[in-house]
Design a protein with these regions (language model features):
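Nucleic-acid endonuclease domains
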Residues: 1-86, 91-209
C-alpha cells in the first residue's frame, strides 16, 4: 500500500506562521533596493491561475470562512485550513487544462482522498484521513474563455464530512466527480456564497445522513 507521509501542523509542533507580505516588498542587492517586488514575482510565477487551481481553491475556501491567514504553512500541515476546531481539506479540479491541445477537455474528473500517515520525529500514526471535512472544488469552465477562476459563478463546491467518505469509500485513493455527485445530501453542488453556512450546518449536525 502506497503511503504518503506528512508532518504535523505548525500549531502542533510550535512552528511560527510566516509573515504575510503586502506584495510591495522589494528585492535588494547589497542593501540597495532593486526595481522588482514580491508582486512582480507573483505575476511572473503564479498569475496563470488555472495551473495553480489548488492554491486558488484553498484561498477561496479560506475567504468564504472569513479567514485572512493561511493555516497550511508551505504545504506541510495535515490539512488546508481549520475552522471552528475542525480540520478542512480542500481539493480542486477542472475540466479544462492549459496544457491540453486545442479544445480538448477532461470529462472524467477525480479528487484525491488518499489516507496518510502522520510522521513527526519518532511518532508514526495509523493510516487515516487527517481531516474532519472535505471541500471538493470544481471549475466548470470547458475552454480557455469560460475557465476563469476569478469568476466565482464558474465554481461548484461539495462539502462532505470525512466520516461519510470513510464509510462509503474505505481505502479508496481517489473519488470521481460522478460518484461524488451521487452521495446522498452531500453530493449536491453549492455556490461560493453558502460555503460557510454549509460547513456550519455540518459542524452543528444540521446536515446528516
Amino acid at each position: 500500500m502506497e503511503v504518503k507521509t506528512k508532518q504535523k501542523s505548525g500549531k502542533e509542533h510550535n512552528m511560527e506562521k510566516p509573515e504575510l507580505l503586502s506584495g510591495n516588498e522589494k528585492f535588494c542587492l547589497n542593501g540597495i533596493e532593486l526595481g522588482f517586488t514580491v508582486r512582480d514575482y507573483w505575476q511572473f510565477q503564479f498569475s496563470n491561475l488555472i495551473d495553480n487551481l489548488g492554491y486558488v481553491a484553498e484561498f477561496l475556501v479560506a475567504k468564504a470562512l472569513a479567514k485572512d491567514e493561511p493555516d497550511n504553512c508551505n504545504g506541510w500541515t495535515l490539512f488546508d485550513t481549520q475552522y471552528r476546531g475542525k480540520r478542512i481539506e480542500v481539493k480542486a479540479t477542472s475540466y479544462w487544462q492549459s496544457w491540453k491541445e486545442g479544445h480538448e477537455i477532461s470529462e472524467q474528473r477525480t479528487f484525491s482522498i488518499r489516507k496518510t500517515h502522520v510522521k513527526y520525529q519518532d511518532t508514526d500514526s495509523k493510516l487515516e484521513r487527517q481531516n474532519d471535512i472535505y471541500i471538493f472544488c470544481l471549475d466548470k469552465g470547458k475552454n480557455k474563455e469560460s475557465s476563469n477562476p476569478l469568476n466565482l459563478e464558474n465554481w461548484t463546491f461539495y462539502v462532505v464530512p470525512t466520516e461519510i467518505i470513510n464509510n462509503l469509500f474505505g481505502n479508496q485513493k481517489t473519488l470521481s466527480l460522478n460518484r461524488l455527485t451521487k452521495i446522498e445530501k452531500y453530493g449536491i453542488g453549492i455556490t461560493y456564497d453558502i460555503i460557510k453556512e454549509t460547513v456550519d450546518n455540518i459542524i452543528d449536525n444540521k446536515l446528516s445522513i
